[in-house]
């Protein structure tokens, strides 16, 4: 299949560079989510490999919300670069996975977090780097639930749309 991780890594690295040079008081945390979610340092991003993982968007959002809760920054936002529809959630100590279509249980948990972020005043901008019709359908529902934004970008055009959105949100004071 198409290489989706390389463009996503390039965008995250470029966003990191933009923020550290143009907006030095801002903080950027990079989170990776497969079956689970974890934080990585910018310096480790080039070495990130894709595993045989599902997409646990819930874990990524929960970790992002935890990090944002601890910050005193008035302007909080989430940029989510994703190449897959949500296919996995954790139930207790076990994983519930379903790669076929859009699983109602997985999607509903994910949409619930989109609504929670909206109520907390945390906009989510989603960048979709795949042309999967199920992913497009999910991203539309997710964006509506959060009142966020979505960019359906080609792998090449991903970077420029990300930076325009970041700068626009900075000017708006979000």
Residue positions per predicted region:
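…and closely analogous acidic/polar surface helices at protein-protein or active-site interfaces
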Residues: 1-30, 49-56, 68, 107
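Short glycine-/polar-rich loops that comprise or flank the Walker A/P-loop
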Residues: 24-26, 76, 120-123, 146-149
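Von Willebrand factor A/integrin I-like adhesion domains
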Residues: 45, 123-174
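Catalytic core of nucleotidyl cyclases, primarily class III adenylyl/guanylyl cyclases
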Residues: 32, 38, 94-97
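Switch/connector loops and helix/strand junctions flanking conserved nucleotide-binding motifs
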Residues: 1, 38-42, 86-91, 134-137, ...
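Von Willebrand factor
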Residues: 28, 37-40, 45-79, 86-88, ...
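VWA/integrin I-like adhesion module and closely mimicked acidic/polar interface patches used
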Residues: 52-55, 84-145
């Amino acid at each position: 299949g198409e290489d989706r991780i390389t463009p996503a890594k390039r965008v995250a690295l470029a966003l990191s560079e933009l923020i550290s040079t143009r907006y030095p008081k801002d903080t950027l945390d990079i989170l990776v989510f497969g079956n689970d979610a974890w934080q990585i340092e910018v310096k480790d991003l080039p070495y990130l490999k894709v595993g045989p993982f599902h997409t646990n968007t819930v874990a990524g959002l929960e970790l992002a919300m935890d990090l944002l809760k601890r910050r005193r920054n008035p302007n909080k936002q989430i940029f989510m670069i994703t190449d897959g529809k949500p296919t996995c959630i954790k139930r207790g100590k076990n994983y519930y996975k379903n790669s076929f279509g859009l699983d109602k249980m997985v999607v509903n948990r994910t949409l619930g977090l989109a609504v929670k972020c909206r109520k907390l005043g945390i906009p989510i901008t989603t960048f979709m780097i795949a042309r999967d019709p199920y992913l497009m359908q999910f991203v539309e529902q997710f964006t509506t639930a959060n009142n966020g934004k979505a960019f359906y970008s080609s792998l090449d055009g991903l970077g420029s749309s990300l930076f325009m959105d970041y700068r626009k949100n900075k000017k708006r004071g979000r």
